[in-house]
Amino acid sequence: MSDGEEKPDGFSFAGIAAGLKDSNKKDLALILAPENSICSGLFTQSIVRASCVDICEQRIKKSSGLIRAILINSGQANACTGDYGIQHTLFATKEVSQLLGINEEEVLMCSTGVIGIPIQIKNLIDNLPNLVKELKTNSLQNAAEAILTTDLVDKKITIETFIEGRKVKISGFAKGSGMIYPNMATMLAFLTCDVGVDKEEWDKMISIAVKKSFNAISVDGETSTNDAFIGINSGKKIDKKFLSKIQSGIDIVCQSLAKNIARDGEGANCLLEVLVEGAKSNSDAIKIAKSICNSSLVKTAINGCDPNWGRIISAAGNSGIDFKLDFLDLYIGDFQILKKGKLNKYDSKKVANYMQTRMNGKYLVEDIVSISLHLNSGSEKGTAWGCDLSKKYVEINSEYTT
Amino acid sequence: MSDGEEKPDGFSFAGIAAGLKDSNKKDLALILAPENSICSGLFTQSIVRASCVDICEQRIKKSSGLIRAILINSGQANACTGDYGIQHTLFATKEVSQLLGINEEEVLMCSTGVIGIPIQIKNLIDNLPNLVKELKTNSLQNAAEAILTTDLVDKKITIETFIEGRKVKISGFAKGSGMIYPNMATMLAFLTCDVGVDKEEWDKMISIAVKKSFNAISVDGETSTNDAFIGINSGKKIDKKFLSKIQSGIDIVCQSLAKNIARDGEGANCLLEVLVEGAKSNSDAIKIAKSICNSSLVKTAINGCDPNWGRIISAAGNSGIDFKLDFLDLYIGDFQILKKGKLNKYDSKKVANYMQTRMNGKYLVEDIVSISLHLNSGSEKGTAWGCDLSKKYVEINSEYTT
């Protein structure tokens, strides 16, 4: 399968079935970046990390971001696998480097899937020549499929714009919260951009984008052993005054992927979008919004189409960020629930009906439940995303699998 | 109804139905402490607090803990009720003080129930004379019932010991995580002790006990607008060398109530008890244990009797506390799962069977799923408690109530 859209110049992608998953679905992906590409990565903050994550960090640092290839496997997360973890990562990246004729230090590896079971290394190695052969500029779709675990849909986006007559493209793909035993949600996301940006600047831009996207979503408040976001740029540089335009593009790609992940959370029926305005800082706003998205009580209320504003305000109150109850304006959809902290007259049946409609709306178009909270204490704002908490979530995650 | 057990000397209790709840169940409680009693209180850290909580804090501080009475109502939480909040609290505590012939500053008030709806103040005030008339030394049971919302069982405990021939008693009662629309879990707990302890010492002792009990439980990670723990002591003082014995007693009472609350979490089938040993500090150990108790993925795995150790380790890794994966010993029940970070041979069917048995075991006797994690990095330990996450939890909290 190939994509219709034009991808960032110089990058090629591959995704194949290498027999790592029992399902025989695609499970091995590769991204090849042009020479002199600049790479930044942000990785799980968990103490328990897969060793492939450590190697990613080390190699990006050591090479000052001069990374050429990223190998990604699904099926086994290669975490908590003792000495196998690092051995298999080193072995696989070395093989890839030899096939591509590059330095092994220029190859990264990300894994997602079952924890505690060694990677199916023989199948992986045997299929590397085939994987490399499949590298094409228009195979991003295959790569996006190959990194999925039990995600219900693939998650990818390409955007383009013209800057001084030059066509500029940014592509991203990601996987979200699939579950395989014994496992947890893992987030992997990759971004490519065909405008050259210096390492230091790129680090900043990636970090800004992640703060407003992947770090602003929550499916179930869990951080995985393998979470990773890697962004690579390559190509002719651009006048500094246009960098803000590139930043906007990266933000759009990251937010789109992040929303896709939240919406595809286990058992979810809607995307929950929480906007907090009137905060003292953007990060305060995001913290409050995230606290609301993270609340089991808010998430179950949404699942039940119950405009339970007390839970929303209480979750905001638990964010650790100071605000005045008497200043709050709260909206669910277009319905104002609180006005300067006091209950506004609203038709709770209409609000419930709004939620009900959204719970059954068209995927990522009309299935967004919006909550907005104005603190009236500053001029900054921020958004976070989540999903409802359903019986299906419990079912998926409590399935008897041993 | 009166209790069989002997309660702390000098304290009396009452609990009646005052028409605050639609169910006509008991909904108004009173604790009367002897003159010169010493009171300490710990309250919700949420930014959104009921004004009765503010008044509790102010009065305890202003009087240096010289508190005589605590009025507690269930039915309405008196939070997010605008000016009514403080007016009703002041009115009710003033009335109580006049009926008891004490200073209004010596009366505290705690509320739990529906948020955003004013307290049924007329019913409350009309019933105060009756409440005061009901005060008896052996009516703790009535008080314990009157503070419940949708708790399935009442939660109370009295312990006694002899110190140099003197009989010493400590009693406590609490309510946990009931739900009424629009509402969230509220925890209220009260402790009385008939040994006199100075304010400064008592503050410390209460704070130590709470850290190891109420602050170490999680039903769904939510903090309420009204959470409160209040401990009062009164009576002859005791040689300082015996204070550690009193501390142990307070710890036992608080932990018993805390475990009761965790076990009675919505939809729960078991008590989850997580012991973390070999930590650098007690608070590190509790943080890790709590992170495990808080994990939706661990809680659903337990609900499914799935010995999903990857989720346990991952939750530990998200606690923010540093540890070495290679040092970890992990047990579920008596089954060793990890040995110095490596998978131990165990019969996963037997582990699943252990969990299954516990999920159907006798209430708070044989229904405890134990997880223990040894970090092998220090000599401190700590325990936290939670419960499984069931479809019933989602059902209870997503019920369509508007």
From Swiss-Prot, chains A, B:
Gene Ontology MF: a single term: L-glutamate N-acetyltransferase activity
UniProt keyword annotations, A-Z: Acyltransferase, Amino-acid biosynthesis, Arginine biosynthesis, Autocatalytic cleavage, Cytoplasm, Multifunctional enzyme, Transferase
SUPFAM superfamilies: DmpA/ArgJ-like (SSF56266)
Gene3D superfamilies to which the protein is assigned, alphabetical: ArgJ beta chain, C-terminal domain, L-amino peptidase D-ALA esterase/amidase
Pathway where this protein functions: Amino-acid biosynthesis; L-arginine biosynthesis; L-ornithine and N-acetyl-L-glutamate from L-glutamate and N(2)-acetyl-L-ornithine (cyclic): step 1/1; Amino-acid biosynthesis; L-arginine biosynthesis; N(2)-acetyl-L-ornithine from L-glutamate: step 1/4
EC numbers, comma separated: 2.3.1.35, 2.3.1.1
Pfam families given in the database record: ArgJ
Residues under site feature: Cleavage: 185-186
Binding site for substrate: 149, 175, 186, 266, 397, 402
Active site: 186 (nucleophile)
Site (Involved in the stabilization of negative charge on the oxyanion by the formation of the oxyanion hole): 112-113
Any one of the GO CC terms: cytoplasm
Subcellular compartments: Cytoplasm
Function: Catalyzes two activities which are involved in the cyclic version of arginine biosynthesis: the synthesis of N-acetylglutamate from glutamate and acetyl-CoA as the acetyl donor, and of ornithine by transacetylation between N(2)-acetylornithine and glutamate.
Assigned protein family: Belongs to the ArgJ family.
Protein name: Arginine biosynthesis bifunctional protein ArgJ
Source organism per UniProt: Prochlorococcus marinus subsp. pastoris (strain CCMP1986 / NIES-2087 / MED4)
